[in-house]
């Protein structure tokens, strides 16, 4: 994801930083204030232009597929299934998974291009307060999330087995290997795309207008929940995930921990679904499911937060720190 960084910008030190910058630095949700010539309407215009770019990219991808489907009857029959099914995870039809996640992945170039066009240099500030995706911290939080969720799923399925439910994985499907490869390649980008939009762009959009982080953490949650077609318990779990991911983004000064949590959560569900241990197409949940997932997410959040403090992970951007990086700061930063 090196394209997320703005590596060609000459650093400029602001001449008159505001008290907010001088005393505490700028927190993640307020980073739009560090872009050149910040205006209240620029983040909003970024979103509108991003939607336009996104639709244009989708057209470029979809039109050739429709033409091929019209010329090849077998492809046409398969393509019709895309509009009839809600079960996108099928080992017999791995292309359905691609059709599900590829449009989400395409949000990344649309957002980054719109951000660069409207707000100018400093696109890397969508990643973190350092102006880049901190790969070492991302790797560490990936390991932490994996450890937490392995324990979580082991407890859940151990409990089910003790209650007499069959929890026998099935490795016999001939399409299993291809599906696993697709999951390992696509899901990290799908998870990152959602984080850049919902925890990156939307948090900084709200933060450019409202100072308190609670607004930036909570206001985007309904949009994230609406993007997932679950019942009330599933929606509650998704909403809690959104709050935890946003809180971690604010606390750690970047998207890395949220991306790690999202990647591992999705990968574990799909990988277990590949061997018939869970139903990866399920849209319903239960109070027990909600409590279990909440416990796993909260454990991850608490440990990641403490680990970040212990390792000295930067959570605010100061003029000096950003000037050493890749961002052009405006002459005056309004708090």
PLM region spans:
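Hydrophobic residues within the alpha-helical transmembrane core of Major Facilitator Superfamily
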Residues: 48, 154, 222-223
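Residue-level signature of transmembrane alpha-helical entry/exit and packing/kink sites
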Residues: 39-47, 96-100, 104, 137, ...
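Membrane-embedded alpha-helical segments of transport systems
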Residues: 52-56, 106, 147, 263-269
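Cytoplasmic juxtamembrane regions at transmembrane-helix boundaries
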Residues: 117-138, 208-219, 329-331
């Amino acid at each position: 994801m090196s394209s997320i960084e703005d590596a060609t910008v000459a650093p400029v030190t602001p001449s008159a930083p505001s008290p907010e910058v001088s005393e505490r630095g700028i927190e993640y949700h307020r980073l739009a204030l560090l872009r050149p010539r910040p205006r209240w309407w620029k983040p909003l215009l970024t979103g509108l232009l991003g939607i336009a770019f996104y639709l244009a990219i989708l057209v470029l991808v979809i039109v050739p597929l429709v033409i091929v489907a019209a010329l090849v009857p077998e492809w046409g029959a398969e393509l019709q299934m895309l509009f009839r099914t809600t079960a996108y995870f099928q080992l017999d039809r791995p292309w359905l998974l691609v059709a599900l996640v590829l449009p989400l992945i395409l949000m990344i170039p649309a957002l980054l291009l719109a951000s660069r066009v409207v707000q100018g240099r400093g696109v890397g500030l969508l990643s973190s307060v350092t102006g880049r995706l901190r790969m070492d911290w991302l790797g560490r939080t990936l390991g932490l999330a994996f450890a937490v969720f392995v324990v979580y799923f082991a407890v859940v399925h151990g409990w089910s087995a003790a209650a007499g439910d069959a929890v026998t994985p099935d490795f016999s499907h001939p399409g299993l290997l291809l599906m696993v490869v697709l999951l390992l390649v696509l899901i990290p980008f799908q998870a990152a795309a959602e984080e850049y939009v919902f925890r990156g762009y939307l948090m900084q959009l709200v933060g450019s207008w409202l100072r308190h982080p609670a607004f930036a953490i909570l206001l985007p949650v309904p949009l994230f929940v609406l993007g997932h077609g679950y019942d009330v318990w599933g929606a509650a779990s998704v909403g809690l995930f959104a709050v935890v991911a946003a809180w971690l983004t604010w606390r750690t000064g970047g998207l890395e921990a949220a991306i790690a949590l999202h990647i591992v959560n999705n990968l574990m569900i799909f990988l277990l679904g590949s061997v018939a241990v869970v139903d990866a197409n399920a849209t319903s949940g239960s109070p027990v499911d909600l409590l279990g997932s909440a416990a796993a997410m909260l454990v991850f959040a608490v440990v990641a937060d403490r680990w970040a403090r212990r390792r000295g992970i930067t959570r605010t951007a100061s003029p000096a720190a950003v000037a050493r990086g890749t961002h052009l700061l405006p002459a005056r930063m309004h708090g």
